[in-house]
């Protein structure tokens, strides 16, 4: 009985999360109906994502290069005392290291 209840709860949670994660978008305004704990919602890689500015900061990198330079992103994050979160197109995202 407990096993069945746990499976049911797991399926319920999984189905809710996949609906949120599967929301596609073309620009940031398509993500207005997504509920996030933060106010920053961005459309990246055609998916809506919630960004927490306390942990993630985006910096603009060389705009002539179509891809993010991973090593310069790592160096920048180290210089400000953070770790690399993701390097995507023209932006380097850093976050505070886990405790």
Swiss-Prot record:
One GO term (biological process): killing of cells of another organism
Keyword vocabulary terms for this entry: Antimicrobial, Disulfide bond, Fungicide, Plant defense, Secreted, Signal
Compartments, record wording: Secreted
Signal sequence segment: 1-22
Record has Signal as a keyword: yes
Location (main, coarse): secreted
CC per GO annotation: extracellular region
Disulfide bridges in this chain: 25-43, 31-48, 36-50, 68-87, 73-92, 77-94
Family: Belongs to the DEFL family.
Protein name in the entry: Defensin-like protein 306
The organism of origin for this protein: Arabidopsis thaliana
């Amino acid at each position: 009985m407990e096993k069945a209840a746990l499976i049911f709860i797991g399926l319920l949670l999984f189905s809710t999360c996949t609906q949120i994660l599967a929301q596609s978008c073309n620009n940031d305004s398509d993500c207005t109906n997504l509920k996030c704990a933060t106010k920053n919602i961005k459309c990246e890689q055609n998916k809506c994502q919630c960004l927490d500015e306390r942990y993630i900061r985006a910096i603009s990198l060389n705009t002539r290069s179509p891809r993010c330079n991973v090593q310069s992103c790592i160096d920048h994050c180290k210089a400000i005392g953070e770790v690399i979160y993701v390097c995507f197109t023209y932006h380097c995202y850093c976050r505070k290291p886990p405790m």
